[in-house]
From Swiss-Prot:
<dbReference type="InterPro" id="IPR022880">
    <property type="entry name" value="DNApol_IV"/>
</dbReference>
<dbReference type="Pfam" id="PF00817">
    <property type="entry name" value="IMS"/>
</dbReference>
<keyword id="KW-0239">DNA-directed DNA polymerase</keyword>
<keyword id="KW-0548">Nucleotidyltransferase</keyword>
<dbReference type="GO" id="GO:0003887">
    <property type="term" value="F:DNA-directed DNA polymerase activity"/>
</dbReference>
<dbReference type="Pfam" id="PF11799">
    <property type="entry name" value="IMS_C"/>
</dbReference>
<dbReference type="InterPro" id="IPR036775">
    <property type="entry name" value="DNA_pol_Y-fam_lit_finger_sf"/>
</dbReference>
<comment type="similarity">
    <text>Belongs to the DNA polymerase type-Y family.</text>
</comment>
<dbReference type="InterPro" id="IPR017961">
    <property type="entry name" value="DNA_pol_Y-fam_little_finger"/>
</dbReference>
<dbReference type="GO" id="GO:0042276">
    <property type="term" value="P:error-prone translesion synthesis"/>
</dbReference>
<protein>
    <recommendedName>
        <fullName>DNA polymerase IV</fullName>
        <ecNumber>2.7.7.7</ecNumber>
    </recommendedName>
</protein>
<dbReference type="GO" id="GO:0003684">
    <property type="term" value="F:damaged DNA binding"/>
</dbReference>
<feature type="site" description="Substrate discrimination">
    <location>
        <position position="13"/>
    </location>
</feature>
<feature type="active site">
    <location>
        <position position="104"/>
    </location>
</feature>
<dbReference type="InterPro" id="IPR050116">
    <property type="entry name" value="DNA_polymerase-Y"/>
</dbReference>
<keyword id="KW-0234">DNA repair</keyword>
<feature type="binding site">
    <location>
        <position position="8"/>
    </location>
    <ligand>
        <name>Mg(2+)</name>
    </ligand>
</feature>
């Protein structure tokens, strides 16, 4: 049985700022763009979160919720430096490290002999080392499979950890809301609820064939996760190639204005996700996906050096006008393809 740890730093960007400037510790702060430039919040500290300030929220909205909020533009070099130090701490225990972003990673410690092989104690030591060496806090989840380790890391935040042992997997899943499973968004959760599927135990008693019929490949993933199946390995060589966000609509849309409004909202989430893996927002290309009421779909892409909303809207408008053929749209998605590190320098120079 594998031993997987998911480590997630606590409000990482904001925590680095509070560490380096103690005067910020007890006041609400957020990292993000300015209100004048229609900026977006990347992360907020816990005092700010008490006012309802959240990541991916427009800065203007955050300031309405919390007028005294101090918005900081961010220092990506400092965040990268801290992230590298954290990964060096991970490497003391295992070479099997799969970074998800600057502030979170999976570790497979199945063969680690430290702490007598106890994943719980290894996670505790890692968190203590981060606190002592960087003066930052981290939370951790420990489980025999990846998605449960990720869920567990959120259960004792901040500065805590949660363990799900192999014999606790099925009891833990029994009452777990399906909305906690990665990939189940608000619209999917609503569709599941309409079928009477609210917790994993509901799916355990539901027809797998019916799930496949209604949700396609994701229905299979949902069935597996609800039964405690996740065979994905921790992959240290995994190179993230893309970042995306999409939304399935409760009702089809038929007018461009509705699509444009949805893209405006999705763009905020896409920018937030991309900034966690590419703080400079440099990309190889960006694109739009439209899925129609007959479940046919189309993808339109454009080579572009940096995430750009105006270009995405133009690409989407082209797809809407040329490929919709009067059909209602049931899903809208945005995505970017990341630069190949080996080609990044040449590609970026060609755009200068």
């Amino acid at each position: 049985m594998r031993k997987i740890i998911h480590v997630d730093m606590d409000c990482f960007f904001a925590a680095v700022e509070m560490r380096d400037d103690p005067s910020l510790r007890d006041i609400p702060i957020a990292i993000g763009g300015s209100r004048d430039r229609r900026g977006v919040i990347s992360t907020a500290n816990y005092p700010a979160r008490r006012y309802g300030v959240r990541s991916a929220m427009p800065t203007a909205m955050a300031l309405k919720l919390c007028p005294q909020l101090k918005v900081i533009p961010g220092r990506m070099a400092a965040y990268k430096e801290a992230s590298q130090h954290i990964r060096e701490i991970f490497a003391r225990y295992t070479p099997l490290i799969e970074p998800l972003s600057l502030d979170e990673a999976y570790l497979d410690v199945s063969d680690c002999q430290a702490c007598s092989g106890s994943a719980t104690l290894i996670a505790q030591e890692i968190r203590q080392a981060i606190a002592m060496e960087l003066n930052l806090t981290a939370s951790a989840g420990i489980a025999p499979i990846k998605f449960l380790a990720k869920i567990a890391s959120d259960l004792n935040k901040p500065n805590g950890q949660y363990v799900i042992t192999p014999d606790q997997v099925l009891p833990f899943l029994r009452d777990l809301p399906l909305s906690k499973i990665p990939g189940v968004g608000k619209v999917t959760a609503k569709r599941l609820q309409e079928l009477g599927l609210i917790t994993c135990s509901d799916v355990q008693n539901y027809s797998q064939a019916e799930l496949l019929k209604r949700f396609g490949k994701f229905g299979h993933v949902l069935w597996e996760r609800s039964h405690g199946i996740d065979e994905r390995e921790v992959s240290p060589d995994r190179l993230r190639k893309s970042v995306g966000v999409e939304q399935t609509l409760a009702e089809d849309i038929h007018d461009w204005e509705s699509c444009e409004s949805l893209i405006e909202k999705l763009y905020i989430e896409l920018e937030t996700r991309l900034r966690k893996v590419r703080p400079d927002l440099h990309i190889a290309r960006q694109g739009v996906k439209l899925k129609f009421h007959d479940f046919q779909q189309t993808t339109q892409e454009h080579v572009w050096p940096q995430l750009n909303k105006a270009d995405l809207l133009q690409v989407a408008r082209t797809a809407w006008n040329e490929r919709r053929a009067g059909r209602g749209v049931r899903l809208v998605g945005l995505h970017v393809t990341l630069l190949d590190p080996q080609l990044e320098r040449q590609l970026l120079l060609s755009w200068e």
